[in-house]
A protein has these predicted regions:
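Hydrophobic positions on the alpha1 helix immediately C-terminal to the Walker A/P-loop
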Residues: 255
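Conserved internal helical-beta-strand scaffold that buttresses enzyme catalytic cores
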Residues: 2-250, 260-589
Length: 589
């Protein structure tokens, strides 16, 4: 399939290390994928679901001890420990290679080695990057064939180039004591052993698209970010694009596939999804920032996905999808999860494969982190620009978190540098729903805390450098918080489709169509500039209350930020210290 010397030399090395019984190249053809699906069903690795109701859909169960990403077992193996930074785990690269190769040695005996050439981003796009993953798991092959562009076309584009990322995955014995996910940024190398779970083994996803790519982006002058990309089309047919970063459990996928309120739809407003998780962004020839989604599918959390919360995501899963660790309805050979509907199956198997009655059981049928892997093309609102190699121009970057008080519904940063500060202080708090008591504030700068492949202080500096490069063309930066609570612990803002009203204000600010009120933290909307027409059980007085900026609360917030910044030591850019001082000063006035 290729004569690329660097690829063939590495594969010889891998064959010698893991000693497979046979080697299969993944060419991307439907015939080959179909024969692999058949094989996976014969061995029990996958279960073929009801082909009338769920055509091309399959169910897979992971080992019970292998159900999520493992941050404690995830390492950045940079040559110098200080390049890894305080937010990552470090391992010395030579020691790591030795340990990993010892674990991997001979582990494919009796197994097949699958070689997956894949492109992150549209094949041949100037923003795309190529990887090769070697795996002993058909489940990984079939997921990668949904999540990335795979096959011969990728090798054709690669040609003789040595610019590609190596990925070795070995299931081994799924021994959690010997489970490691290691990244070697200087070597473009990822090694994952003793896991079969999505985020640990689909090496194109967080491992390559964020951890390795963030390092490449810093060195090559572009950005790899944990952000959705969506397009907003107005009644005149013009589309403007925004990217948005949220920590987990803040509704990123829901926002990416938002359906505008009925009043807006009737006027002709539409939302188009470009991506729900990762954005690669670089400056275009016209000086603006352009974004692509490096992925080709959605790896979404199943529980809570339903026709009300996110119809577009649910519709995306109705064909050609792999479900992982959800409940199996034996009556009609379909799947079920908590929050899908109010009618759990009685004759079912839970995510561990044990008999389960959803009406009487105390246990959950689906694992809380159970997943669907669905082709992006299935999404009813997928953007026409999805495969566009040069990407889409970004008008605004939105940061967000889950805060009960303090942070207003939306505010705009004063400028790019202040926007970097806003992203660096992003936080969510765990709310104990029953008591309405506010939990612990967990800061997750730009939602990249678990995914930045190098020192976060250098990462902040890279943001400042990108701002300098973009100059006048830099997108405007905003922060949103859909999660303000009243004193009884109820959400004040209706959220979901109504979030479109805030997006509309954001775009008006980008176009200079509305004024805003300057506050201690940035620009906040005048309440009358957010359209409340057709909104249920909500009034302008409540809106005013969630747009308030409480200086005393922000002064306290500044203390928390100062504490958080300490860990970055002298790698923290001086500009962030200056921004913090400005915030303190503004709150004291």
């Amino acid at each position: 399939m290729t004569n690329n010397k660097s690829v063939l030399a590495w594969l010889d090395e891998m064959k010698e290390l893991v000693t497979p019984d046979e080697v299969v190249w993944i060419d991307g053809s439907e015939e080959q994928l179909e024969s692999l699906r058949k094989q996976a069903c014969e061995t029990g690795e996958m279960i073929k679901l009801n082909q009338e109701k769920l055509p091309g859909c399959y169910l897979h169960r992971t080992a019970i001890n292998d159900v999520a990403r493992v941050e404690g077992r995830t390492f950045i193996c940079s040559r110098k420990e200080e390049d890894c930074g305080p937010t990552n785990h470090w391992m010395e690269p030579q020691a790591a290679y030795k340990m990993l190769f010892d674990i991997a040695r001979g582990s494919y005996k009796g197994r097949t080695m699958y070689v997956i050439p894949y492109s992150m981003g549209p094949v041949g796009s100037p923003l795309a990057k190529i990887g090769l993953e070697v795996t002993d798991s058909i489940y990984v092959v079939l997921n990668m064939a949904i999540m990335t562009r795979v096959g011969q076309a990728v090798l054709d584009v690669l040609g003789d180039s040595e610019d590609w990322v190596k990925g070795l995955h070995c299931k081994c014995d799924i021994d959690e004591e010997k489970r490691y996910i290691c990244h070697f940024p200087e070597d473009n190398y990822i090694i994952s052993v003793n896991s079969g779970y999505g985020g640990n083994v689909l090496l194109g996803k967080k491992c390559f698209a964020l951890r390795i790519a963030s390092y490449l982006g810093k060195n090559e002058g572009w950005m790899a970010e944990h952000m959705l990309i969506l397009g907003i089309e107005n009644p005149q047919g013009e589309v403007k694009y925004v990217t948005a970063a949220f920590p987990s459990a803040c509704g990123k996928t829901n926002l990416a596939m938002l359906i505008p309120p009925e009043g807006y739809r009737n006027k002709g407003y539409k939302v188009w999804t470009v991506g729900d998780d990762i954005a690669w962004m670089r400056q275009g020839a016209d000086g603006k920032l352009y974004a692509i989604n490096p992925e080709n599918g959605f790896f979404g959390v199943a529980p809570g996905t339903n026709m009300k919360s996110n119809p577009n995501a649910l519709i995306s899963t109705q064909k050609g999808t792999i479900f992982t660790n959800v409940a199996h309805n034996l009556d009609d050979n379909t799947v079920w999860w908590e929050g899908l509907d109010k009618n759990p199956p009685e004759n079912a198997l839970d995510w561990t494969g044990e008999p389960w009655n959803g009406k009487t059981s105390e246990k959950k049928g689906a694992h809380p982190n159970s997943r669907f892997t669905a082709p992006a093309k299935n999404c009813p609102c997928i953007s026409a620009e999805f495969d566009k190699g040069e990407g889409v121009p970004v008008s605004a970057i939105i940061f967000g978190g889950r805060r009960a008080q303090t942070t207003p519904l939306v505010y705009q940063s004063r400028d790019w540098n202040n926007g970097v500060f806003v992203g660096s202080i992003m936080a969510s708090e765990t709310t104990a729903a029953a008591t309405g008591a506010v939990g612990v504030v967990r800061r997750d700068p730009m939602a990249m805390l678990p995914f930045c492949g190098y020192h976060m202080g250098d990462y902040f500096q890279h943001w400042f450098e990108m701002g300098e490069k973009l100059g006048e063309n830099a997108p405007k930066i905003f922060n949103v918080n859909w999660f303000r609570l009243d004193s009884e612990g109820h959400f004040l803002w209706p959220g979901f489709g109504d979030n479109f009203r805030v997006l509309e204000w954001i775009l008006k600010r980008c176009e200079g169509e509305v004024d805003a009120k300057e506050t201690a933290i940035g620009y906040v909307p005048y309440a009358e500039d957010i359209n409340l027409e057709g909104i249920q059980d909500f009034d302008i007085e409540t809106l005013k209350s969630i747009l308030e900026v409480d200086k005393a609360a922000w002064a306290k917030e500044a203390e928390g930020i100062e504490e958080f910044y300490k860990q970055f030591g002298d790698k923290l850019p001086q500009e962030l210290r200056n921004q913090l001082e400005t915030l303190k000063k503004n709150c004291a006035e």
